[in-house]
């Protein structure tokens, strides 16, 4: 069965330029989130994207050699959509005991700082905790309160809020007055996997037609 995948890989390589052009065209048609991840299942005879996450938690798995490149891409995205941004506030999940997740947040912070941004971390839910224990050590949190529906971090207002919270429990307060990446409406409080597959299907059909499968 694995030969099917090998044959498909060869076809994709042959169609590389056409696929690249198709993807560039599709990216130009929709707003692209600052980050994201997909869950892929490979059964040996079929490969499928089974989920998409707009608030990924796997940055701690990135190799150190890739970090400068990713920091540059993140900076380019922020500069393009928020050219005056100097300060990014990272709004995390409240997973205070998940060291892997904490390390993910620490890595995002490092990428932002490598890109030249000031980066603070915290949320009203985590206010007063002080720090979280990550794999490489403690991650310092900044005091965050909601004042007039705006996030107040150490008495100031950040230029941009970077969400790393999938909003499973619903919308959080304090975001309305800020520019927020990714948009809060992409959280799980509104998204459905059935809708994800409906949107994905048309792209699947287009690419299959392009590569004649």
Enumerate the predicted regions with their spans.
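Structured alpha-helical segments in the cores of large, soluble enzyme domains
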Residues: 71-79, 166, 204-209
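Short amphipathic alpha-helix with an adjacent loop that forms part of the alpha/beta core around
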Residues: 143-156
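A short, gly/pro- and small-residue-rich
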Residues: 161, 167-196
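Conserved small/polar residues in nucleotide/adenosyl-binding loops
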Residues: 211-213
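Conserved, structured core domains in eukaryotic proteins
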Residues: 127-129, 160-164, 189, 203-206
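Conserved acidic residues
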Residues: 86, 154-161, 178
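ATP-dependent carboxylate activation and anion-phosphoryl transfer catalytic cores
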Residues: 1-131
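Charged, often glycine-rich, active-site loop that binds/positions anionic groups
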Residues: 130-146
